[in-house]
């Protein structure tokens, strides 16, 4: 048998069989912990840990994969938070965990999207949906981490790769504010860096609000729209409506790395 499912595990009898299976899938991205492949027939993403690819012959399973625990990987599988895509299955070779499976979202990473052309109203509605999901995960005691480049968008947000999330005994309200600020920071990077830094630095109110963890990014975007509309003397529904106020100087080494082309 080439592969079989055992409970919540998809088990392959050898590393060779898993490698052959992956060749039938579509590579869709790499991260610090592993590589992802899409199975278009099942609409699933297979994330395979880096150790799998680093071994040319056989795997020192006990040494390399001992850190991976099924309960740990699937600890959020039953939490219903629509903006989050959690692991729902594990992948094993001879019973040793080498990756996990999650559902696929037909969306792009934020850093692959041109922020000038998206509808700000749709963006705000999508942010509100994330806030609702963040309330759910915060009530479960989950502390988010490493959201950069792990947020997808296509009229709504999908947050992926929760490998480094953890349970925390912080008060729910404080935890929500912490998690919300983590998400907000990525939206600030996406919308502002290398595009509107100069405009914001010249406006006292926006400068005060920008990146302030006590002010949510939803409120900031509404204020930004108002200020931009005032400057260009017309409603601003997307940032390209205010092209002439964009940065005059190109940012040489932006912190937020975009992949637009």
Model regions and ranges:
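Juxta-kinase regulatory segment immediately upstream of eukaryotic protein kinase catalytic domains
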Residues: 1-26, 64-68
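ATP-binding glycine-rich loop module of kinase domains
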Residues: 21-90, 113-114
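Conserved catalytic motifs of the protein kinase core domain
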Residues: 41, 96-98, 155
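Protein kinase-like catalytic core scaffold
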Residues: 44, 83, 100, 158-161, ...
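Conserved protein kinase catalytic core
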Residues: 53, 109, 167-169
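Conserved structural core of kinase catalytic domains
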Residues: 80-127
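Conserved kinase catalytic-core helix
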Residues: 113-152, 157
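C-lobe/activation-segment region of protein kinase-like
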Residues: 154-261
């Amino acid at each position: 048998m080439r592969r079989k499912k055992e409970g919540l595990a998809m088990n392959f009898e050898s590393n060779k069989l898993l490698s052959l299976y992956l060749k039938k899938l579509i590579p869709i991205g790499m991260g610090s912990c592993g590589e992802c492949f899409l199975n278009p027939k099942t609409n699933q993403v297979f994330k395979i840990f880096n150790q799998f690819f680093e071994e040319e012959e056989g795997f020192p399973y006990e040494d390399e994969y001992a850190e991976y625990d099924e309960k740990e990987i699937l600890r959020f599988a039953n939490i219903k938070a629509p903006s989050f895509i959690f692991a729902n299955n594990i992948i094993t070779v001879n019973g040793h965990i080498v990756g996990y499976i999650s559902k696929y979202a037909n969306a792009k990473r934020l850093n692959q999207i041109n922020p000038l052309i998206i509808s700000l109203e749709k963006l705000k509605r999508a942010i509100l949906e994330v806030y609702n999901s963040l309330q759910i995960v915060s009530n479960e005691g989950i502390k988010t981490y490493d959201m950069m480049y792990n947020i997808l968008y296509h009229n709504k947000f999908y947050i992926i790769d929760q490998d480094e999330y953890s349970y925390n005994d912080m008060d729910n309200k404080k935890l929500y504010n912490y998690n919300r600020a983590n998400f907000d920071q990525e939206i600030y990077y996406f919308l502002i860096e290398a595009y509107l830094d100069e405009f914001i630095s010249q406006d006292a109110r926006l400068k005060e609000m920008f990146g302030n963890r006590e002010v949510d990014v939803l409120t900031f975007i509404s204020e930004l729209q108002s200020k931009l509309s005032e400057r260009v003397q017309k409603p601003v529904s997307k940032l390209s409506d205010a092209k002439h106020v964009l940065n005059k100087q190109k940012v040489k080494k932006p912190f937020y790395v975009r992949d637009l082309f």
